[in-house]
A protein has these predicted regions:
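Cofactor-/ligand-binding subdomain signature composed of acidic, glycine-rich
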Residues: 1-36, 57, 277, 303
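Glycine/aspartate-rich loop-and-adjacent alpha/beta segment that forms the canonical ThDP
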Residues: 2-3, 225-323
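Cofactor-binding active-site loop characterized by glycine-rich and histidine/acidic residues
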Residues: 29, 33-165, 183-189, 194, ...
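Acidic, glycine-rich active-site loops and adjacent beta-strand->loop/helix elements
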Residues: 65-71, 145-151, 173-179, 210-213, ...
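Conserved thiamine diphosphate
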Residues: 133-137, 189-221, 263-290
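A short, conserved beta-to-alpha structural element at the edge of catalytic cores
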Residues: 165-185
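Short beta-alpha connecting loops at secondary-structure transitions
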Residues: 177-182, 202-207, 252-260, 285-286
Length: 323
């Protein structure tokens, strides 16, 4: 673990990060038992929870599609509501008008990805940061996206605007090394996203995405810098997509021995082992936390499965438009 755990506040924060990752994984594991087309983020929880747990309630968060449910949980969403949304039940965030794992919670300062189009959330984040700059609030904004989306032109338009106008935004690449079946080693010219971002004159750094404490520290420092009016930061959080692009993806296009090596770097197991070795948790504590997360997910899934399906009333004007 890159950051020593040596005080009560840090211990509490790191336990919170561990619980956040465990809850996210438990919900995703439950979902994959009923959905063959879910886009799992197993092994990427360090980037997701490290980023979204660094946000204050006033900050703005925009998640990548992979892990959007984990990000929503990190921001206080009800797991039953998120699962209901994936199942298309009336108790979901869209009341059944849309089903899928792209739908996050509806909440102030949090914007889920409500379609499969990748990249627009980067522009939304830049716009949110511009708004906070113009109104003088200077709240921080953080957006996550994959290395495939990092080749989108909108990212570079956004980096340029954020740098030119010194906007309070943190760009976090959830760099899992695959865009469906295309490895990033064959898709990123020059091999470095950090060099690309640094060319815009902003701080740009690479962190170990499987070290949730390192991610949380980097994002927290970048957000503090943003709130001080010192502008944007780019963070390339290197991780690995140990699951398929979707649940039923056999991953025949890649070397499974590499996947096995990355599985050994699991962010949950790394933090749990660190807390145990530091004497801040026992293995029984870790097991109890995991069991609690799995019980919560199981209950949420059972409840959501029993929830009603939508009827035609969900497209009535009062349910489709804000007052």
């Amino acid at each position: 673990m890159s950051v020593a755990i040596n005080n009560r506040a840090a211990n509490s924060a790191h336990r919170d990060l561990l619980l956040s990752m465990m809850r996210g994984r438990a919900v995703e594991d439950a979902i994959q038992k009923v959905s063959g087309h879910y886009h799992p983020a197993r092994g990427e929880e360090g980037v997701i929870c490290g980023t979204f747990r660094a946000l204050s309630d006033a900050d703005v968060g925009l998640p990548h599609y992979r892990g959007s449910i984990i990000a929503s949980l990190s921001r206080g969403a009800d797991p039953r509501e998120l699962i209901a949304g994936l199942l298309g039940k009336v108790t979901g965030p869209t009341r059944g008008r849309q089903r899928g794992d792209f739908v996050g919670k509806f909440a102030p300062n949090y914007f889920g990805l409500f379609s499969g189009t990748l990249g627009p959330s980067i522009g939304y984040a830049t716009g949110a940061a511009l708004a906070s700059k113009l109104d003088g609030s200077n709240v921080g904004t953080a957006v996550t996206f994959g290395d495939g989306t990092a080749n989108s032109g909108l990212l570079y338009e956004s980096l340029n605007m954020a740098a030119m106008y010194v906007l309070p935004v943190v760009f976090v690449c959830q760099h899992n090394q695959f865009a469906v079946s295309m490895p990033s080693s064959r898709a990123i010219a020059g091999g470095s996203l950090v060099q690309r971002a640094a060319a815009f004159g902003m701080p740009a750094l690479e962190v170990d995405g499987n070290d949730v404490v390192a991610v949380h520290t980097a994002v927290s420092e970048a957000l503090a810098r943003a709130r001080r009016g010192e502008g944007p930061t780019f963070i390339d959080a290197l991780t690995y997509r140990v699951s398929g692009h979707w649940t039923s993806d056999a991953c025949t296009y890649r070397d499974q021995s590499v996947t096995e090596e990355w599985t050994k770097r699991d962010p949950i197991e790394r933090l749990a082992a660190s807390l145990v070795s530091e004497g801040l948790m026992t293995q029984d504590d870790v097991d109890a936390m995991r069991a609690s997360a799995e019980s919560e997910a199981s209950t949420a899934m059972a409840t959501a499965q029993d929830d009603p399906w939508p009827d035609a009333s969900v497209i009535d004007a009062p349910n489709a438009f804000a007052e």
